[in-house]
């Protein structure tokens, strides 16, 4: 049985309060309540990819927001992928792949590279889309200057061939930096 779905991309500013509430509720459902308001805030202000069924119910979501990384003396514009989730009863049906394809199109057209912090459950999807685990050092450039983060889980990158001999320093933010 094939289910008809529609994929839509839209900036946060173009989503209705009802659409945003549905996406937020999907995060709570998919992450079993382990998706904080801070996590949600990180996914706002960029482009969202939303997959709906024929009745208009939201099945999958992801967003890409702009951030900056310093690498090897350059400041790079990053499409940072956030809030990727599929309704639990619809996982493993290609919906996450639709979301990632749409977000990767945005990254390819608007950014120097894509970066994300994978969940254990999502890593297989990202690898299938060509995302690679960063093997170099990571850190942040924040209010206190450069802070190395040797215990940080490695992010994944897409669309750029960066030298892991040089640290990947991402802009600081509240909550999880990566």
Language model feature labels by segment:
Residues 53-56, 89, 159-163:
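Short loop segments at secondary-structure junctions
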Residues 2-15, 108, 120-178:
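Terminal substrate-recognition subdomain of acyl/acetyltransferases
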Residues 81-91, 121:
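A short, internal acetyl-CoA/4′-phosphopantetheine-binding micro-motif in the GNAT/acyltransferase core
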Residues 105-119:
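Conserved GNAT acetyl-CoA-binding A-motif
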Residues 64-66, 99-103, 137-142:
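Short acidic (Asp/Glu) patches
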Residues 89-102:
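Conserved acetyl-CoA pyrophosphate-binding loop and the N-cap/start of the following alpha-helix
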Residues 22, 102, 121:
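Short Gly/charged-rich anion-binding patches and loops
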Residues 9-85:
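A conserved beta-strand-loop-helix scaffold within acyl/acetyltransferase catalytic domains
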């Amino acid at each position: 049985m094939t289910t008809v779905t529609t994929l839509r991309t839209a900036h946060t500013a173009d989503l209705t309060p009802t659409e945003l509430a549905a996406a937020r509720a999907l995060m709570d459902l998919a992450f079993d309540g382990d998706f904080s308001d801070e996590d949600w805030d990180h996914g706002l202000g960029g482009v969202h990819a939303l997959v709906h069924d024929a009745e208009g119910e939201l099945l999958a979501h992801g967003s890409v927001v702009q951030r900056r990384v310093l690498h090897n003396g350059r400041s790079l514009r990053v499409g940072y992928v956030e809030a990727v989730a599929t309704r639990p009863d619809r996982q493993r049906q290609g919906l996450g792949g639709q979301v990632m394809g749409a977000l990767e199109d945005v990254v390819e057209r608007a950014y120097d590279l894509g970066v994300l912090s994978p969940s254990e459950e999502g890593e297989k999807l990202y690898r299938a889309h060509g995302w690679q685990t960063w093997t170099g050092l990571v850190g942040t450039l924040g209010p206190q200057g450069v802070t190395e983060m040797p215990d940080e889980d490695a992010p994944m990158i897409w669309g750029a061939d960066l030298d892991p001999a040089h640290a990947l320093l991402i802009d600081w933010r509240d909550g999880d930096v990566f």
